[in-house]
Amino acid sequence: MTKGPVRLDVAVSYALPRAGLPSAVSFRKWVAAALKGRIREADLAVRVVDEKEGCSLNHHYRGKDYATNVLSFPAELPEGLPKGIKMPLLGDLVICAPVVAREAAEQGKSLAAHYAHLTVHGTLHLLGWDHEDDKEAEAMEQLEREILADLGIDDPYAGEH
């Protein structure tokens, strides 16, 4: 765990009208909560998209023919950088607004809480966390619960296991 302040630059863009969507300030708060104590500085982008763009990206990068709630694209350091140079670029998150809204309604969660959860979840993926097996999934879900609790948000997995 790192201590001290986090230097954070979160660029938020919207590919659809912003009415009813979280503000850039909210996304920054959720990303900062996920990074707290883990890294000291980071640059990342959050893009909120419609279903068409979400489906296109999910198809192109994952071979899936549907839009998913969040996609994480970790940054890769360019080849040839001198040793010792560290780039704070963490990566990009793509969040599909219609999928998030549908899931929140189906799961009986507030829209803001679901956006917060998916932003934290995606940010943890950028840090290298995954849920490919049960042990990884349990560890990642527990960390998400702790981060969201610090934000005053209920356990997003309550009732699932």
Curated annotation (Swiss-Prot):
Cofactor(s) it depends on: Zn(2+)
One GO-annotated biological process of the protein: rRNA processing
Keywords: Cytoplasm, Endonuclease, Hydrolase, Metal-binding, Nuclease, Ribosome biogenesis, rRNA processing, Zinc
Any one cellular-component term (Gene Ontology): cytoplasm
Chief location: cytoplasm
GO molecular function: metalloendopeptidase activity; RNA endonuclease activity; zinc ion binding
Residue positions binding Zn(2+): 121, 125, 131
Cell compartment(s), UniProt: Cytoplasm
Cofactor binding mode and count: Binds 1 zinc ion.
Presence of the UniProt keyword Calcium in the record: no
PANTHER family linked: ENDORIBONUCLEASE YBEY, CHLOROPLASTIC (PTHR46986:SF1)
Family: Belongs to the endoribonuclease YbeY family.
Protein name: Endoribonuclease YbeY
